[in-house]
Amino acid sequence: RPSFLGGSIYDELKGRNKFNYTVRLIEDLGYKEVMSKTGSKTLFVAPDAAYEEFFKNNKWGVSSYEQLTDAQKRILFNGAQLNNAYVIEMMGNADNGDKNLALRQNSAAAVVDSVRWWSPEELPTNYSQVEGEKHYWDRFKGEKGKSILMATDDSEPMMTHFIENNMKEQRVRRSDVAFIVGDKNGWNESDPTRAYVFGNRVMEQDVVCLNGYFHVLDKVLVPPSSMAEEIRSNGETNIFSHILDRFSAPYYDATLTENYKALHN
């Protein structure tokens, strides 16, 4: 075996002894066999030190690994995984072969990963006093202590990335990329090349394994939610969120329901 080729993704992460939280995600979600065998996978991982910082401050309010729900574990793991083997440089290529034109890739995440129980207090309110206008959420709010299973976004989850060659193709400056992703340290033209996934910087790339690659990030990758959910939950756009809530309603999705049952049975 060539010297540059490591073991499987699982074995390589476990052997380095600084990705223990990622290893726990793999084991808890039943992916040990998948990540131990040959195949085509790409995984973005954060070191244990990054997880310790994550548990100090995060949007879920969890302070330890043990407090993560199964849904949150799936978001962290599947949202950082691609069902193909990619070195960083190749991630900017489109499916049709065009180079440096892709800004996003389909992740291994699924809508069912984000399904969770919502309490009556968490559900939207149809703010309207117009006569005859329906308040679709009221029937769920009337029963105190009742919760419903729901996903807030039915679109296919994707991973957004900023690759150097991709940015050059679109004539986007490094300083612009740093501003977009919120890198307070900036990115000067004289600095070495970089890559970002959402707002996370790739610190070590293209670790070659028997069944794909993994890339090391500076922070724990938490895929952002939909635009409507970000507006609802960021604390600074509550009034605008109430306007959107007026026109919102719960919809039954038979396919999603069956997928959820299959996942939990």
Please tell me what each predicted stretch does:
Residues 1-265:
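Mature, structured domains of secreted/extracytosolic soluble proteins
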